[in-house]
Amino acid sequence: MKIAVYGKGGIGKSTTSCNISVALARRGQKVLQIGCDPKHDSTFTLTGFLIPTIIDTLQSKDYHYEDIWPEDVIHKGYGGVDCVEAGGPPAGAGCGGYVVGETVKLLKELNAFYEYDIILFDVLGDVVCGGFAAPLNYADYCVIITDNGFDALFAANRITASIREKARTHPLRLAGLVGNRTSRRDLINKYVEACPMPVIEVLPIIEDIRVSRVKGKTLFEMVGSEPSLNYVCNYYLGIADQILSQPEGIVPKEIPDRELFSLLSDLYLNPIGGGGQKKNKKEILLGFTRI
């Protein structure tokens, strides 16, 4: 099974992906996590350091695939999760989609691509071009990480459009949304009511999730010295169980941008029950300028 994890930049995709990967490994799966981001920090919390990228390795070998061994590019992470970082082209040059393609090509050359029960692609930010939608070409399921805010749900909506487009030619389905570090879910609920899709899990605001990223450890590793964090791991184990159940998934139909703006801004301007999230129109419009 191949899973592509998408979501707005900075939403916590890599931290979530690493913990899901360990949870899947705890369920007896052989897991490979592939970081698809030029920052090459997707697997940091699994390995504790920035591993060499596929592109760096290919360049050092002058693109002679026959000179590369699996141990040159596949690094063992916490919990037995294997880790690969695709890397990326120089800033302002090249295509990230090409890098993903080269990564898959090399793993196939090494007879490694089909050795895993689960391959998880952790993909940077929003889908802004066909290149960064490339992991969807290989995925069975897409999981979207979001929170209860405008920007993240707008990004999620754009990603659903990419899933729908890729599903025309690939057996791809959306497994659902994962809400990360959010104290409310009213906007999430409003969005999935208008654009029906499963909500796999919504994680509350837990400071240790953020701290784990800084420490370079998964929650599962931290629980060894802090048993009180075991309840947090159960969230990720629950997500893993839902993925392993091979859900039917859906091909979503995105909401037009203006309709989504109206939908979410209406909830902000007229919050259910009053108070809480009420903002003036100027604040909302300023929020949308950041999209």
From Swiss-Prot:
Its EC number is 1.3.7.7. Binds 1 [4Fe-4S] cluster per dimer. InterPro entries: NifH/chlL_CS (IPR030655), NifH/frxC (IPR000392), P-loop_NTPase (IPR027417), Protochlorophyllide_ATP-bd (IPR005971). SUPFAM superfamilies: P-loop containing nucleoside triphosphate hydrolases (SSF52540). Transmembrane segments: none annotated. Pathway: Porphyrin-containing compound metabolism; chlorophyll biosynthesis (light-independent). Its cofactor is [4Fe-4S] cluster. GO terms for biological process: light-independent chlorophyll biosynthetic process; photosynthesis, dark reaction. [4Fe-4S] cluster binds at residues 95, 129. Component of the dark-operative protochlorophyllide reductase (DPOR) that uses Mg-ATP and reduced ferredoxin to reduce ring D of protochlorophyllide (Pchlide) to form chlorophyllide a (Chlide). This reaction is light-independent. The L component serves as a unique electron donor to the NB-component of the complex, and binds Mg-ATP. HAMAP family: ChlL_BchL (MF_00355). Belongs to the NifH/BchL/ChlL family. This is Light-independent protochlorophyllide reductase iron-sulfur ATP-binding protein. It comes from Pinus contorta (Shore pine). The lineage of its organism: Eukaryota, Viridiplantae, Streptophyta, Embryophyta, Tracheophyta.
